[in-house]
């Protein structure tokens, strides 16, 4: 008989951890999830992309998600603070104001996706459903239990120190999965965390009841899209996400220095930012704020390693950049999906050395690299993003990214084309789009981590 309590201990019961537990439990792997909070709890990151659909179907939770009656998300839209004509620079299919854009997810077929929509979710309810589902499949789930430390003895032998109030318990496992989100428990413990060299984002957000979503669009069929409103403030935008029929999540995302240099409280900063979009500001003021403002900092970081002897990092515990394209839950679910395959094989082979997880390492680094480069190119020249969305030559390639379909292991050529155009704009101060360049520098094609 094994002297291990579990094959795998999973730190964190958010979407990454619960999805990992579901895959492992379905495969007969003895696993336990330790979540320091008691669900339900509030959490940001409320809009999904279609790349989450195959995962939700595979682990068998989709029916429960559907019964929760979360708003359906058929598409996404981006609105501009600018007005007036602009040179189209040879792009095709652009309308009179191509600084705005919109997409329907069903314009492009995606493997494993069986519907035209995904969901906007109340993360408190969504995360609880996923965690309870993992338990129903046979994973052990412990809430209100914090992991204080992890001791790596040898590949296949790990001691996890768990705390419940003043009581400490040692748990023996063959390996650990860090799904602790932005707490990045193992990343800090092992000295793996690195601050992102480009991003230093900051968000302020709340929920509003009876917000008039028609203020963002004249099309009734689009009121339940996610809306991203560009603001005239550098590197600043607003999300607008339906949560229920009447409640809308609204948040301002900016570079942290924009906030710290303002001498405003974060609530004052929120209102000053949205004031630059009159329709949005007026609609928010006419609604009822039903949650206190919350701020999210420490947004952007990476890890020097995402796996090693007896450990794997997934979801936000592995990487987080920026929420502009709703990538967070998709990265959580897909990193769990990819890593679970390696872990199941490691358990079968009783081999928990780093080499057992190299498939996951390559796949997730490539997928997140695609997200990262897409996001940085957007911030460098967002008028180029909206031009590519509208141009039929590039629309489906951009839609692939917006669907979250980035885990094929292949290089996405559309990113090279965007980079090429940005380089031309950067090198020519007389270029008609030069004035739209953001102040974030596009990194090399191969990130440092």
Curated annotation (Swiss-Prot):
<dbReference type="GO" id="GO:0016491">
    <property type="term" value="F:oxidoreductase activity"/>
</dbReference>
<feature type="binding site">
    <location>
        <position position="327"/>
    </location>
    <ligand>
        <name>chloride</name>
    </ligand>
</feature>
<feature type="binding site">
    <location>
        <position position="35"/>
    </location>
    <ligand>
        <name>FAD</name>
    </ligand>
</feature>
<keyword id="KW-0274">FAD</keyword>
<feature type="binding site">
    <location>
        <position position="16"/>
    </location>
    <ligand>
        <name>FAD</name>
    </ligand>
</feature>
<keyword id="KW-0285">Flavoprotein</keyword>
<dbReference type="GO" id="GO:0017000">
    <property type="term" value="P:antibiotic biosynthetic process"/>
</dbReference>
<dbReference type="GO" id="GO:0047651">
    <property type="term" value="F:alkylhalidase activity"/>
</dbReference>
<dbReference type="GO" id="GO:0071949">
    <property type="term" value="F:FAD binding"/>
</dbReference>
<keyword id="KW-0045">Antibiotic biosynthesis</keyword>
<dbReference type="InterPro" id="IPR036188">
    <property type="entry name" value="FAD/NAD-bd_sf"/>
</dbReference>
<feature type="binding site">
    <location>
        <position position="329"/>
    </location>
    <ligand>
        <name>FAD</name>
    </ligand>
</feature>
<feature type="binding site">
    <location>
        <position position="41"/>
    </location>
    <ligand>
        <name>FAD</name>
    </ligand>
</feature>
<dbReference type="Pfam" id="PF01494">
    <property type="entry name" value="FAD_binding_3"/>
</dbReference>
<feature type="binding site">
    <location>
        <position position="328"/>
    </location>
    <ligand>
        <name>chloride</name>
    </ligand>
</feature>
<feature type="binding site">
    <location>
        <position position="316"/>
    </location>
    <ligand>
        <name>FAD</name>
    </ligand>
</feature>
<dbReference type="InterPro" id="IPR002938">
    <property type="entry name" value="FAD-bd"/>
</dbReference>
<comment type="similarity">
    <text>Belongs to the flavin-dependent halogenase family.</text>
</comment>
<keyword id="KW-0547">Nucleotide-binding</keyword>
<feature type="binding site">
    <location>
        <position position="44"/>
    </location>
    <ligand>
        <name>FAD</name>
    </ligand>
</feature>
<dbReference type="InterPro" id="IPR050816">
    <property type="entry name" value="Flavin-dep_Halogenase_NPB"/>
</dbReference>
<comment type="pathway">
    <text>Antibiotic biosynthesis.</text>
</comment>
<feature type="binding site">
    <location>
        <position position="43"/>
    </location>
    <ligand>
        <name>FAD</name>
    </ligand>
</feature>
<keyword id="KW-0560">Oxidoreductase</keyword>
<feature type="binding site">
    <location>
        <position position="47"/>
    </location>
    <ligand>
        <name>FAD</name>
    </ligand>
</feature>
<feature type="binding site">
    <location>
        <position position="123"/>
    </location>
    <ligand>
        <name>FAD</name>
    </ligand>
</feature>
<protein>
    <recommendedName>
        <fullName>1H-pyrrole-2-carbonyl-[peptidyl-carrier protein] chlorinase</fullName>
        <ecNumber>1.14.19.56</ecNumber>
    </recommendedName>
</protein>
<comment type="subunit">
    <text>Homodimer.</text>
</comment>
<keyword id="KW-0868">Chloride</keyword>
<feature type="binding site">
    <location>
        <position position="147"/>
    </location>
    <ligand>
        <name>FAD</name>
    </ligand>
</feature>
<comment type="function">
    <text>Involved in the biosynthesis of the antibiotic pyoluteorin. Catalyzes the dichlorination of the pyrrole ring of pyrrolyl-S-PltL, generating the 5-chloropyrrolyl-S-PltL intermediate and then the 4,5-dichloropyrrolyl-S-PltL product.</text>
</comment>
């Amino acid at each position: 008989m094994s002297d291990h309590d579990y094959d795998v201990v999973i730190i964190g019961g958010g979407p990454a951890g619960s999805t990992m537990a579901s895959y492992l439990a379905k495969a007969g792997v003895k696993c336990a999830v330790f979540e320091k909070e008691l669900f339900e709890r509030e959490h940001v990151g409320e809009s999904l992309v279609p790349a989450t659909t195959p995962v939700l179907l595979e682990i068998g939770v989709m029916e429960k998600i559907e019964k929760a009656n979360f708003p359906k998300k058929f598409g996404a839209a981006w609105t501009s603070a600018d007005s007036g004509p602009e040179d189209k620079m040879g792009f095709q299919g652009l309308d009179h104001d191509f600084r705005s854009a919109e997409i329907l997810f069903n314009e492009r077929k995606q493997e494993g996706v069986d519907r035209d929509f995904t969901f906007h979710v109340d993360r408190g309810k969504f995360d609880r459903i996923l965690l309870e589902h993992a338990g129903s499949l046979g994973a052990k789930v412990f809430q209100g239990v914090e992991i204080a430390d992890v001791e790596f003895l040898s590949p296949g032998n790990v001691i996890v120190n768990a705390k419940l109030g003043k009581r400490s318990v040692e748990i023996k496992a063959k390996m650990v999965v860090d799904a602790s989100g932005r707490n990045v428990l193992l990343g800090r413990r092992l000295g793996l965390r690195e601050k992102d060299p480009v991003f230093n984002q900051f968000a302020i957000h709340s929920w509003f009841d009876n917000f008039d979503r028609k203020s963002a669009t004249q099309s009734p069929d689009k009121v339940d899209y996610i809306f991203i409103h560009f603001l005239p403030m550098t590197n600043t935008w607003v999300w607008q996400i339906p949560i229920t029929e009447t409640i809308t999540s609204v948040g301002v995302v900016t570079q942290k220095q924009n906030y710290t240099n303002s001498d405003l409280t974060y609530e004052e900063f929120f209102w000053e930012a949205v004031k630059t979009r009159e329709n949005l500001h007026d609609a928010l003021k006419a609604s009822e704020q039903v949650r206190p403002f919350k701020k999210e900092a420490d947004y952007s970081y990476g890890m020097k390693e995402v796996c090693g002897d007896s450990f794997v990092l997934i979801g936000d515990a592995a990487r987080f950049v920026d929420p502009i394209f709703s990538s967070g839950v998709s990265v959580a679910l897909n990193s769990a999906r990819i890593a679970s395959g390696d872990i199941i094989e490691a358990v079968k082979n009783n081999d928990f050395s780093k080499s057992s997880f190299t498939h996951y390492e390559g796949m997730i680094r490539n997928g997140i690299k695609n997200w990262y480069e897409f996001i940085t190119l957007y911030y460098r020249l967002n008028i180029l993003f909206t031009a590519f969305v509208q141009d039929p030559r590039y629309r489906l390639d951009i839609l692939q990214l917006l669907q979250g379909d980035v885990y094929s292991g292949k290089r996405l050529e559309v990113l090279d084309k965007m980079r090429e155009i940005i380089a031309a704009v950067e090198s020519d101060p007389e270029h008609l789009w030069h004035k739209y360049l953001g102040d974030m520098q596009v990194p090399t094609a191969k990130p440092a981590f």
